[in-house]
């Protein structure tokens, strides 16, 4: 490799990578260029050299893709929260389908060349879709600003009118930053000041209820701030404080205390409502969640005699779509508050065939089997890290008749399929665009036990 940092080179972009970057070859060296699109001829500058590839900065597009558009966001290049807003939305959907093909080719689970990969299901209006806002805070010249860190940095980009963020959550976040400034609430920095680190605002689309978490690494007096905030926004029904003193990139600490209002908000999906406590996980895009869950119901295709396990169940939302269709439903999650929500939700909806426990799937499922419980169907919705090796071992040991894997990371999905297709036939993969203008996608995978 003869390339050097700061060297400027011409490049033909052959494809797009998992983070939305353009990928080309220069003298047989792989080059990654954020902002470049497939089919473009560009001029770029090398920014870093790795063992098997180099990274470069886009300087000029000599031949533009006909699908390149001008992003609507004025700080698109500065923020980094979205990666492919400069690509026409129809082509974004094609790109996300292609990501599945790329991941499968890399990990090569048995028979992947013949998998049915269905076109990605997109949104009618791909904007203002994020019902949950999670912004970092910093103080600049005595003014508190909230936003996201620029990519690969701790430089805060203030966001006051984000095009993918629910409008109401954005308005509340803007006002919260003003109140933090007015009341001179300490804001954490990179050196020695302790105070507010992060603000979270989540809005239930079905009910309009809002909950707020203020993440801090010291005890604060927020009484007057909260009083003014809830006066300005009557839809706020919960304000909580999460204490995180760890010097890590983890946003939340273990302790969350509600300092005003009720324990949870009410949200709805498909034909049922449920409670969400502040720390409980729920999908960020409510509109596409309806699509995702409908696809999961269709793929699992349960019957009334089935016993179903909902791993990574959260507050029970996916499982509730099946509760009236199966004989029994069991779920687990590592967040105890989510399990308590799941129990309350099931009771309120009148389900008497459900059972929930806090803990990991790889620990709980083997115990259930030892106790005599046998699942005919399994649904998994793991984090981006994919399935734990112990859980994979458990699945391969007990092999429920049918399984649906909901993935938010095509790479870990393809990796996990290498083992799963040892015992399952893969019927199809249906991707759903949960995060327009970003390089992320979700996929529903239908698996049936081999005969």
From Swiss-Prot:
Domain annotation TRAM: ranges: 2-60
Pfam families noted in UniProt: TRAM (PF01938), tRNA_U5-meth_tr (PF05958)
Enzyme class name: transferase
Signal peptide: none
Entry EC number(s): 2.1.1.-
Annotated InterPro entries: MeTrfase_TrmA_AS, MeTrfase_TrmA_CS, NA-bd_OB-fold, SAM-dependent_MTases_sf, TRAM_dom, U5_MeTrfase_fam
Keywords from the named record: 4Fe-4S, Iron, Iron-sulfur, Metal-binding, Methyltransferase, S-adenosyl-L-methionine, Transferase
Record-level Gene Ontology MF annotations: 4 iron, 4 sulfur cluster binding; metal ion binding; rRNA (uridine-C5-)-methyltransferase activity
Residues involved in [4Fe-4S] cluster binding: 73, 79, 82, 162
Residues the record lists as binding S-adenosyl-L-methionine: 283, 312, 333, 381
Active site: 408
CDD domains xrefs: AdoMet_MTases
UniProt-listed GO biological process terms: rRNA base methylation
PANTHER family: PTHR11061:SF45, RNA M5U METHYLTRANSFERASE
Family stated for the protein in its record: Belongs to the class I-like SAM-binding methyltransferase superfamily. RNA M5U methyltransferase family.
Name listed for the protein in its UniProt record: Uncharacterized RNA methyltransferase spr1717
Organism: Streptococcus pneumoniae (strain ATCC BAA-255 / R6)
């Amino acid at each position: 490799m003869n390339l050097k940092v700061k060297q400027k080179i011409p490049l033909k972009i052959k494809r797009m990578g998992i983070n939305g970057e353009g990928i080309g070859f220069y003298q047989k060296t792989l080059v990654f260029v954020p902002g470049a699109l497939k089919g473009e001829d560009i001029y770029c500058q090398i920014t870093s050299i790795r063992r098997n590839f180099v990274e470069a900065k886009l300087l000029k597009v000599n031949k533009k893709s006909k699908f390149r558009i001008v992003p609507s966001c004025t700080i698109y290049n500065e923020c980094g929260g979205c990666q492919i807003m400069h690509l026409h939305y129809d082509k974004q959907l094609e790109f996300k389908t292609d990501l599945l093909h790329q991941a499968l080719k890399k990990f090569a689970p048995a028979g992947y060349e013949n998998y049915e990969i269905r076109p990605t299901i997109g949104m009618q209006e791909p904007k203002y879709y994020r019902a949950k806002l999670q912004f970092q805070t910093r103080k600049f010249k005595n003014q508190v600003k909230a936003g996201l860190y620029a990519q690969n940095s701790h430089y805060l980009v203030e966001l006051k009118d984000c095009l993918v963020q629910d409008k109401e959550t954005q308005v509340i976040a803007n006002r919260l930053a003003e109140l933090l400034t007015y009341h001179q609430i300490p804001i954490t920095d990179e050196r020695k000041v302790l105070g507010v680190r992060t603000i979270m605002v989540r809005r239930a689309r079905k009910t309009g209820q809002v909950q707020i978490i203020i993440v801090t690494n010291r005890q604060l007096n927020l009484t007057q701030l909260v009083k003014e905030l809830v006066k300005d926004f009557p839809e706020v029904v919960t304000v909580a404080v999460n204490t995180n003193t760890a010097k890590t990139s983890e946003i939340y600490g273990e302790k969350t205390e509600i300092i005003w209002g009720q324990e949870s908000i009410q949200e709805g999906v498909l034909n049922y409502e449920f409670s969400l406590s502040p720390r409980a996980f729920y999908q960020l895009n409510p509109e596409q969640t309806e699509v995702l869950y409908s696809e999961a119901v269709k793929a699992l295709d349960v019957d009334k005699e089935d016993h179903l396990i909902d791993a990574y169940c959260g507050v029970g939302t996916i499982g509730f779509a099946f509760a009236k269709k199966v004989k029994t439903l069991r779920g687990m999650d590592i967040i105890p508050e989510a399990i308590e929500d799941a129990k309350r939700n099931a009771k309120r909806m009148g389900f008497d065939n459900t059972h929930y426990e806090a803990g990991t799937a790889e620990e709980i499922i083997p115990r259930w089997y030892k106790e005599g419980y046998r699942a005919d169907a399994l649904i998994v919705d793991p984090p981006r890290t994919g399935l734990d090796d112990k859980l994979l071992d458990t699945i391969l040991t007990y092999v429920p008749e049918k399984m649906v894997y909901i993935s938010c990371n095509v790479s870990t999905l393809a990796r996990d399929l290498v083992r799963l297709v040892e015992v399952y036939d893969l019927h199809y993969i249906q991707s759903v665009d949960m995060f327009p203008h970003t390089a992320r996608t979700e996929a529903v995978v239908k698996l049936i036990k081999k005969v």
